[in-house]
């Protein structure tokens, strides 16, 4: 994951902190402030910031729409509080941020763990969801190889990607909490149970499922998710892994914006 878009995307953004369930949640709003269309909410990956997950995509995504990007609990500019990281809580925090901003309905683009949060939002608060983009995410533990899950039992902060460490240390209000953030992120994945096929079938929002052909998420699993979702489209990106999917491929944000802009059948 690279940071090349981080400076450019902040030039004309509205920035602030929102009081959300005991957090002071950092957010930015990009794009035309008076745009009456449905805003897009970006849900970043684990151990990341919205810049590391979406920095290279955000300028294109923000053309013609408002884009809300934020750092969730204990990530980036949002300080941690004394509670674990859970997908349910992250979903509640995202919806509370929208309520704080006076937004009743939005599109959601979740990458990796952000995709898991998007799934939880669609299940817990379907009324706030117009469309979903779920990128490099899984709905149960069959979505990745056993070795992936086993790796969390002996994860060390030394194994954390350097770009993610540097991004955290650059902006975190309490940089010394990096080891705690890493430990909480590992625990969240150790506790991951996912959702049943019946729950995935109950998501009726139009959904674009995106995965790389060399992703941590098995492409076959993405196909299964696509088949379960009642109103889904599927994109399997060639020669793409879990990290390179965040690189500035011009056709990725174009594919996403085309999906969001096309009227749902």
Indicate where each model-derived feature is located:
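Catalytic active-site module of serine/aspartate enzymes centered on a nucleophile-bearing elbow/loop
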Residues: 238-265
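Conserved alpha/beta-hydrolase "acid-adjacent" motif
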Residues: 216-221
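Short beta-strand/loop motif that positions the catalytic acidic residue
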Residues: 203, 209-211
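Flexible "cap/lid" loop of the alpha/beta hydrolase fold
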Residues: 116-124, 130-164
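Active-site loop/oxyanion-hole signature of alpha/beta-hydrolase fold enzymes
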Residues: 55, 62, 69-109
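Active-site nucleophile elbow and catalytic-triad environment of alpha/beta-hydrolase enzymes
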Residues: 183-199
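Catalytic histidine neighborhood in serine/cysteine hydrolases
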Residues: 222, 228-243
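Conserved HGGG/HGGXW glycine-rich cap/lid loop of the alpha/beta-hydrolase fold
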Residues: 23-77
């Amino acid at each position: 994951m690279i940071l090349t878009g981080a400076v450019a995307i902040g030039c004309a953004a509205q920035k602030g902190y929102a009081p959300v369930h005991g957090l002071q949640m950092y957010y930015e709003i990009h794009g035309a402030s008076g745009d009456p269309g449905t805003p897009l909410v970006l849900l970043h990956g684990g151990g990341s910031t919205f810049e590391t997950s979406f920095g290279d995509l955000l300028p294109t995504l923000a053309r013609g729409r408002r884009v809300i990007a934020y750092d969730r609990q204990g990530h980036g500019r949002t300080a941690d509080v004394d509670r674990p990281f859970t997908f349910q809580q992250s979903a509640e925090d995202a919806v509370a941020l929208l309520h704080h901003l006076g937004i009743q309905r939005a599109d959601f683009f979740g990458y990796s763990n952000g995709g898991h949060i998007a799934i939880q939002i669609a299940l817990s608060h379907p009324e706030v969801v117009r469309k979903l983009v779920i990128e490099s995410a899984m709905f149960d533990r069959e979505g990745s190889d056993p070795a992936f899950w086993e790796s969390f039992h002996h994860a060390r902060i030394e194994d954390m990607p350097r770009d993610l460490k540097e991004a955290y240390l650059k902006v975190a209000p309490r940089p010394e909490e990096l080891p705690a953030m890493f430990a909480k992120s590992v625990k969240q994945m150790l506790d991951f149970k996912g959702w049943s096929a019946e729950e995935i079938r109950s998501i009726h929002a139009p959904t674009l499922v995106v995965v790389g052909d060399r992703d941590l998420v098995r492409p076959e699993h993405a196909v299964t998710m696509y088949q379960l979702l009642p109103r889904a489209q599927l994109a399997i990106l060639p020669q793409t892994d879990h990290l390179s999917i965040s690189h500035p491929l011009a056709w990725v944000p174009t594919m996403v914006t085309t999906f969001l802009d096309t009227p749902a059948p």
